[in-house]
C-alpha cells in the first residue's frame, strides 16, 4: 500500500521548481494533493490526475503572503478533500533574488522576502493548525535551507528569512506537539531544479563551490529530497518533531 494513502496534503509553491517534485512525490505515495502556487498549477494537476486519478489532485493560484488568500486556500482544500493531514510550506523567494551587500538591500525588497519566506509559512500554519488540532494529528514540513548553518555573503535577506523558518519550526513544534502534530524543517543544499537553472548568476557562483563543500561530491537534484519529504509526511516520523533534517550531501554536519 502507498505510504500516504488516504491523506491530504497542501504544497505551497507546488507548481514548479522543487515544489513540483514534492507535489508529484506525495501523489505517487497515495496522497491527495492541493497544488498551491502564485503560478498556475493546472497543467501539473492534469498530469498528476492522469497518473493517479482526477480525485487525487487540485490546484489553486494564490499569494502565500496574503492572509485572506491563505484562509481561502485552506477552505478550498477542506471543501475538495474534507481534511488536511500534511502541510508543506515550500513557497519562497530564491531564484529571482539579487545578490546584494547588506548595505545595498532596499527595505522594500527585504520586507518582500520576509513576507513570502516567513510570513507565508506562519499564515499557512495559523489557518491549517486548527483543523489538525481538531483531528489530533498532522505533519507540517517547513522547507528551510542549508545556508542558515554557514551563512552566505551578499544574500542576507534570504538567509535571514530561512533562519526564521528554522526558529518557527522549533517554536511551534513545542506548541502543537500535545495535539499529535509533528513539525520539522527539511533543509536542502544547493539544488539544481529547473527554475534554479534559469538564474545563471546563481549557478555560476554556487554550483562548483557547493559540490566542493560536500562529503558526497556531486550535484544535488530535487529527487534527492523526496525520500526525506515522504518520511516526514508519513507515520514513520510520528515521534520526530522540532528537527532540522539537512539533505545536502554532507555540506553541513548538523
Please report, for each region that a protein language model flagged, where it lies by residue.
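Canonical Rossmann dinucleotide-binding motif of NAD(H)/NADP(H)-dependent dehydrogenases/reductases
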Residues: 2-34
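Active-site helix of classical SDR
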Residues: 125, 161, 169
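Short C-terminal tail/terminal secondary-structure segment
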Residues: 94, 98-99, 150, 212, ...
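A glycine/serine/threonine-rich, flexible loop-to-helix segment
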Residues: 178, 185-214, 224
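Alpha-helical segment proximal to the catalytic Tyr-Lys
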Residues: 130, 174-178, 238
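Substrate-binding pocket helix/loop in short-chain dehydrogenase/reductase
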Residues: 70, 98-111, 206, 210
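C-terminal substrate-recognition "lid" of short-chain dehydrogenase/reductases
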Residues: 122-125, 133, 137, 218-247, ...
Amino acid at each position: 500500500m502507498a505510504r500516504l494513502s488516504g491523506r491530504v496534503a497542501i504544497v505551497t509553491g507546488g507548481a514548479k521548481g522543487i515544489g513540483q517534485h514534492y507535489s508529484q512525490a506525495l501523489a505517487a505515495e497515495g496522497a491527495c494533493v492541493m497544488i498551491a502556487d502564485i503560478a498556475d498549477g493546472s497543467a501539473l494537476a492534469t498530469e498528476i490526475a492522469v497518473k493517479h486519478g482526477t480525485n487525487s489532485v487540485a490546484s489553486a493560484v494564490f499569494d502565500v503572503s496574503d492572509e485572506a488568500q491563505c484562509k481561502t486556500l485552506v477552505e478550498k482544500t477542506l471543501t475538495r478533500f474534507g481534511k488536511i493531514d500534511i502541510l508543506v510550506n515550500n513557497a519562497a523567494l530564491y531564484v529571482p533574488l539579487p545578490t546584494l551587500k547588506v548595505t545595498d538591500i532596499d527595505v522594500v525588497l527585504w520586507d518582500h522576502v520576509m513576507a513570502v519566506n516567513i510570513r507565508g509559512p506562519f499564515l499557512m500554519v495559523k489557518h491549517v493548525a486548527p483543523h489538525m488540532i481538531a483531528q489530533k494529528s498532522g505533519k507540517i514540513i517547513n522547507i528551510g535551507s542549508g545556508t542558515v548553518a554557514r551563512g552566505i555573503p551578499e544574500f542576507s535577506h534570504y538567509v535571514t528569512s530561512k533562519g526564521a523558518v528554522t526558529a518557527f519550526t522549533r517554536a511551534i513544534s513545542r506548541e502543537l506537539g500535545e495535539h499529535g502534530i509533528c513539525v520539522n524543517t527539511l533543509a536542502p543544499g544547493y539544488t539544481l531544479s529547473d527554475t534554479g537553472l534559469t538564474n545563471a548568476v546563481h549557478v555560476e557562483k554556487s554550483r562548483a563551490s557547493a559540490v566542493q563543500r560536500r562529503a558526497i561530491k556531486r550535484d544535488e537534484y530535487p529527487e534527492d529530497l523526496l525520500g526525506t519529504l515522504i518520511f516526514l509526511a508519513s507515520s514513520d516520523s510520528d515521534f520526530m518533531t522540532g528537527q532540522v533534517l539537512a539533505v545536502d550531501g554532507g555540506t553541513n554536519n548538523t
